[in-house]
Amino acid sequence: MKDSQSKIHPGSGRRKALEFNKGRQSDDQSIDDLKNLIPNEYFRQRDMLIESLHLIQDHYKCLKPKHLTALSELTNLPLTEIYETASFYAHFDIYKEDDISPPETTIRVCDGITCEMNGCKTLEKNLSDSVSSNVRVVRAPCMGRCHQAPVVEVGKKHFVNADVSVVQKALEEQDTKPVIPNYISYDDYVKNGGYKILNDCIENKKDPMKLIEEMEQSGLRGLGGAGFPTGRKWRFVRAENKPRLMAINGDEGEPGTFKDHHYLTRDPHRFLEGMLIAAWVVEATDVYIYMRDEYPDVIKFLKKEIKILEEKNLNIKTRIHFRRGAGAYICGEESSMLESLEGKRGLPRHKPPFPSQVGLFGRPTLIHNVETVFWVREILEKGAVWFSSHGLNGRKGLRTFSVSGRVKNPGVKLAPAGITIKQLIDEYCGGIQEGHTFKAYLPGGASGGILPAKLDNIPLDFDTLQELSLIHISEPTRQVP
C-alpha cells in the first residue's frame, strides 16, 4: 500500500488524513519544564491531575496553554479534559500564551460576610491604590478566619485584623510564607495518652464491633452538616465488600466556618488518631485527606506530622494520602469531593448509590469531616455516656460553634448541643458589642438562610431548623448588624 493510501481514515472514502496531529502541539521545552517540576508517577495517575495543576500554578503563578498541552501529552489525557478540570477551580489562573504572567506576589482580600462587615471593600480599594505594579490585588472567598476580620492573604501568609500598613510592611519584608502555629507536637501528644487506643487497635486488643457500639451510644453525628450518626455509618461501611476506603473532608468552605482550622492548628494528632481509629474499624486500606488550599499553614505542618506517623508505623494498617482542594465551594459536598479526589471537576454525583456503597474509585468509602473524627479518641476514653450527658433543650452531645460578627468575644465556642443563639451570645461571647443591636443571625452558613433576632430561642442543633425551611450546615454562627 502506498504511503498516501495508508493515511486514509476508515470509512472516510477518498479523504486523506492530515499528515500531522490536529490541535495544539506540545513543545520540547514545556515537556521538560513539567518533567522537572512534577514527579514522574503523577503522570500515570489520573487522580493526581489536580495536584499536578497545583504544582504548575505554584511555580509559574498561572496556567498557560503550552504547559496544559504538555501535561496532556505526558498524562495521555485529552487537552479538553485538562482544560475543563483546570477552569472549574477558582485557584487556577488560566492565561493565554501571549498574556503577561501575573506578578510574583498576589494580595487576596477576603470578601466573606464578616470581612464585608469590617470594611473589606474599602481595604481592597486602598491596597489597589497603594501597591506597586508588580503586585496584584484580588478579592477572594472566605478564608476561615472570620473572628479576626478583615483578613488579607499576602502570598501564602494570612494577616488578620489587617490594614494597609500591615500589608505594606509584609511586602517590604517579603513576609509571604505561612506561619506554622504552636500546636501540640507528636511527643507531647503521646505523653498525654495519645495513640494508646490506636496502638491497641493495631495490636488487635480492641473489638471493632464494640467500638461501633460505643460510638452509636454516644450519639455523635457527622459534624460536617448532614448529621448522620457516626457509629451507624461505621457499621454500614464495614458491612460492604472489600477493599474499602476512607476520605476526610477538610474543605471547610462554608462562609463563616473556621472550627476545623481551629482544631487542626492546636491539636492535629487528636484528629489524626481519630481518623486512623475509624479507618481501622472499617478496615479501610487507604485514607485520603482533602484539605482546602486556603489553609497553607495546615497543609505544611500536617504533611510533616503524617511523615512522623509513617516513621512510627502508626499507619501500618492504612496508607495516608494528602490532597489539596482548589477553591471550589461545591467540593464541600461529599460526592463532589470524591470527584475532585479522582482528579476531576467537582460535580455532585447522583444518589443512590451512596458513598458507603460506591464511593472513591468505585469502592465503599467512609467519609467524615475533620471535627467528627476529632472527637473519636475522647469519646472512646471517657465513654459514650460522657458525651451524651451534655446537651440542652432535649438535645445530646457537644457542638462547636464558629461565632463572628458584632459580638464582644468572637471565636470558636464549645457548647452543649441545643443551646440557643441568645445563650451562646450572652454566656459564651460576652454579649453584643457596644453601640450595636442584635438584629439577625446565620445559623448554618450562607446556604442556611438568615433568622431574625426574634427567633433567638431556637435550639441550635440538627433537625431543629427544618420546620423553618433552613439547612443546618456546621454551626458557623454570625450576627448581622
Name each model-derived stretch.
Residues M1-P65, T69-L74, L79-E84, F88, ...:
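Iron-sulfur (Fe-S) cluster-binding modules
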Residues E51-H54, E81-H91, S101-T122, V138-K157, ...:
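Local cysteine-cluster metal-coordination motifs and their immediate loop/turn environment
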Residues Y89, D267-V281:
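Histidine-anchored nucleotide/phosphate-binding helix
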Residues Y189-K196, I248-D260, P355-V358, S402-V407:
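Gly-rich Lys/Arg/Thr-decorated short loops/hinges at beta-loop-alpha junctions or inter-strand turns
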Residues E216-R235, G327-E339:
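Conserved phosphate/anionic-ligand binding catalytic regions in large, soluble enzymes, centered on
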Residues M291-I299, K304, H436-A440, G445-L460:
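Terminal amphipathic helices with adjacent charged low-complexity linkers/tails
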Residues I299-A417, C429, Q433:
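Hydrophobic alpha-helical positions that pack around
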Residues I471-P481:
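Single conserved hydrophobic/aromatic residue that forms the stacking wall/gate
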